Amino acid sequence: RQPLRILEVGGGTGGTTAWLLPELNGVPALEYHFTDISALFTRRAQQKFADYDFVKYSELDLEKEAQSQGFQAQSYDLIVAANVIHATRHIGRTLDNLRPLLKPGGRLLMREITQPMRLFDFVFGPLVLPLQDLDAREGELFLTTAQWQQQ
């Protein structure tokens, strides 16, 4: 039997991971791959989740092709992306970088803020990388549900 293969992208401090791993613990034939752009976050996650022997850890830059970073096409059943895709320069290209990693019938599970948050944009907007898809974002950092569906 093939293992269920899950890829978490932009895992950061492990908030979503900490919620998911206890639920997945004990699932037979499971591989969970925690990734983040930062080696610091991947090292911290490795320490934090050391009790889960079905987890492996790697760096992954979502803005680059995953295959050029050592990831195989059509190798994951599920990709988990919690509040990370919006933080990339070009959402469409980021999604294009993730799609090839999914097995046929695989799914992308995203959690993103979908309501405009002008105060958040005002405070944190200057800290965000220069965005290249301002037309798609319509001047906001976060996309609405309808805008995500167009991606």
Where are the regions a protein language model picked out?
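4′-phosphopantetheine-dependent carrier domains
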Residues: 1-151
